[in-house]
Every structure is written in C-alpha cells, then in structure tokens.
Design a protein with these regions (language model features):
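Core nucleotide-handling region used for phosphoryl-transfer chemistry
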Residues: 1-316
Length: 316
C-alpha cells in the first residue's frame, strides 16, 4: 500500500488536496493526535509532508519533534540516554515555518505545513525581498538537483506578529530536507555549507556546540531562563531533534487565549480565576490594560503579545 493511502486510512492524519496544485496532497497530524499524544511513524511524519498521487514526496517538513519534558521520550533522563554528541544548539526564532521547494518549471512551491495558505503569500514576499534573481536561480538549482526542501523561519512583524520582537522582515534557513519518505537533513542546517548565492537569507543562529551532559544541562538552564529568546532547538549527531522554550515565553503565550477572549467580549477577567497565570493576568489587566495591535493578515484586533512579553520582562 502506498504511503498516501496509509495516510488516508489513518484517523489521526488529515490529508487534503493542496489548493492551486494538481494531484498534490498535504498530510498533517490531527488535533486529536496532538491532544492525546498519538505519535507513531505516520503522525510524526505527517507534519508538512506533501505527496503526489503517485506517492512522490514533492515538499517535506521536519518530522514532529518535542519540547524537553513534553513526553516520556523527551524527559531529561531519556534525552541523556539517547543523544549522540556533539549536539548543535540554535536559537529558536519566533516566526512561522515556511517550506520552499523547486517545481519543474523553474518556479517554487511556497508552502506552510498546510500547503497554499494566506501565509504562503508572506513566505514568497519575504523570499523575494531578501533575494535577487541570480540568488533565486542558485537556490532553485540547488533544491532541484538535490531534490530537497528548504525549511525556513519566516519573520514578518507587520503581518504576523508573535511574542519575541523583530524590527524587520527576516528569513532564516533552518535545514535542507531530502524530499523522501524517511526524514533526512542533507546539509548542515546551521552554517552555510552550500557556497554563496543566498542573498540576504540568514542561516539559523547556531550558538552552542555541546560535547557532554554537563554542557547540555548548562545550555538548557540558559535557555529556560532567557528573557529575550523564544528558546533553543537542539540536533544531535544522528539528527535527533528536541527543543525548549524559555519560561518567560511560555508564561506570555499561556495568557494569549485569555487576553483575546477578553478583548472580543466573549469572556471576562474573572472567568480565568482558576488558571495558574491569573495573578499575572490580573496585574497586567489592571495596571496596563490589554495591549493591542491590528493583524493585517487576519484583519482583526488582537492582543499584542510582544508588548505583554515586554511588560513581563521589565515589570513583573
């Protein structure tokens, strides 16, 4: 049975035709898989996996990987047993994942994990801003000849504001992933080993190379206590990946649904009294109000979590 048919039969995988493409299907794990922790060879692979009707992989994202402590496999004890040193540690940029791959006609796929979405426009926008025509030809040739997807983190604060502040649009190259069913990074994702010709695209900021358990513990502590970063992404010598998010980032993000519900009028402050973050939420609400911004992508007024993060960093 083809992988596409196996994905179609799996109740924990969504398979949807990609808008604007012929015979191309986006495979992603379902909300239930995420909610109940149903992780197996199909659900972990179905995270931005794009298959044609003949079972060819045309675009591919990362396999699902987890935060430290998110499950038994990523407890610190399990990680210490499993990893192979050295481990490369990169800054986890706070944007959204873009997947760029070569079409046969000299053009590109610009996909999010779901395929052609409204955010695909932003991927293409930032890509075109950061590259010249010669750069794009170099990138297309490399992706086509290597049969690879370039996974990127897209930063576009005017249209897609997150928690960590950025002053301008950026695009960080995270990895070159082989377009095949088995996950394989085909090039060093954190430094430019492919020569010049990538315009103003940046490679993900590799800030630590870790050689033993003691160093790993120290870097984890640095990441957890960071006041300015979302967190870190780790990749060991066998391409086993895991991540962490800073305590401040997690605290900020946890309040986002509540703040947006209060802004929309669906709920009141006191509706969140049973939440662990209520004391902080109440203090921000009574002292500063809920900061807002106009989301140019969704066309809605939303809680400005960058401002909330700044309040927490400096006042609470």
């Amino acid at each position: 049975m083809s992988l596409l048919n196996k994905m179609l039969e799996n109740k924990y995988v969504n398979v949807k035709p990609v808008e604007g493409e012929d015979n191309l299907y986006a495979c992603n794990f379902t909300r239930d898989a995420f909610k109940h922790g149903i992780w197996n060879q199909y659900t972990t692979t179905a995270r931005g996996l794009f298959l044609s009707s003949d079972d060819t992989v045309c675009v591919r994202g990362f396999n699902k990987f987890f935060n430290i402590g998110e499950n038994k496999e990523t407890s610190l004890e399990a990680i210490f047993r499993k990893v192979e040193y050295p481990i490369f540690c990169a800054v986890k940029e706070n944007g959204f994942l873009g997947l760029i791959s070569a079409k046969e006609n000299g053009e590109f796929y610009f996909f999010t994990k779901a395929g052609n979405t409204i955010y695909s426009i932003l991927i293409e926008k930032v890509f075109l801003e950061k590259t010249e025509e010669t750069d794009r030809k170099n990138i297309w040739n490399y992706l086509h000849d290597s049969n690879a997807t370039m996974a990127v983190e897209v930063i576009c604060p005017e249209y897609d504001k997150h928690i960590i502040p950025y002053k301008k649009n950026e695009m960080f190259i995270l990895a070159f992933i082989k377009n095949q069913k088995t996950f394989e990074i085909i090039n060093e994702p954190f430094i430019n080993t492919c020569g010049n010709g990538y315009g103003q695209l940046q490679f993900a900021r590799n800030i630590y190379t870790i050689w033993d358990e003691e160093e790993l513990e120290k870097v984890i502590s640095i990441g957890e206590n960071s006041r300015i970063l979302e967190g870190f992404v780790f990749r060991d010598s066998n391409n086993y990946m895991f991540k962490l998010k800073s305590n401040l980032y997690k605290k900020t993000k946890a309040m986002r649904p509540a703040m947006n519900s209060i802004l929309s009028g669906k709920k009141k402050l006191e509706d969140f009294k049973n939440k662990p973050y209520y004391g902080t939420l109440e203090k921000i609400y009574l002292t500063f109000g809920i900061p807002t911004w106009y989301n140019n992508t969704t066309k809605r007024v939303e809680a400005d979590m960058t401002a909330v993060h700044d309040i927490l960093k400096n006042n609470i």
